[in-house]
Regions:
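Nucleotide-state-sensitive switch-loop elements of NTP-binding domains
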Residues: 3-15, 21-48, 59, 65-146
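Hydrophobic anchor at the beta1->P-loop junction of P-loop NTPases
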Residues: 51-53
Length: 146
């Protein structure tokens, strides 16, 4: 039986990776019970630096992110990456190209990478991305890259 959304608040604020991923998944899926939990979590947000990176395909975004994450980690700071990928025309999910190019970062305990599909949202930003940033901010990451 899945953990109720309201029971994810404390583990998320404690930086529990599984709870963070579950809450982001529920936000992406549009679960109606997320709003109350997000409102509580939002009170703890506002400490992270958030940087958005955009560009045409093949312009080096993933390479830049990978290099930037390495540099920030050498300073001992934690980093979360929200990789917004185009949606697959077949599944509606993320194509995951960015995540594949950043595989060496996934085993670093100071790095959290989450891919999100645009799911048809205009402007290339998934609808749940801003909520994901708030969740990651409240969970204690120093830097969040989108």
């Amino acid at each position: 039986m899945p953990i109720p959304t309201n029971e994810l608040e404390e583990p998320v604020l404690a930086g529990n990776r599984r709870a963070i991923a579950r809450l982001i998944s529920r936000v992406e899926a549009g679960h109606s019970d997320c709003r109350r939990t997000l409102a509580k979590i939002y009170r703890n947000a506002g400490q992270a630096h958030v940087i958005g990176i955009t560009g045409v395909p093949g312009s080096g975004k993933s390479t830049l992110v990978r290099s930037f994450v390495h540099a920030v980690r050498q300073q001992g700071r934690t980093v979360a990456v929200v990789a917004i990928d185009p949606s697959s025309p077949f599944s509606g999910g993320a194509i995951l190209g960015d995540r594949i190019r950043m595989l060496e970062l996934v085993n670093d305990p100071g790095v959290f990478i989450r891919s999100m599909a645009t799911r048809g949202a205009l402007g290339g930003l998934a609808r749940a991305a801003l909520d994901a940033v708030d969740i990651l901010d409240a969970s204690g990451f120093d830097l969040i890259l989108i």
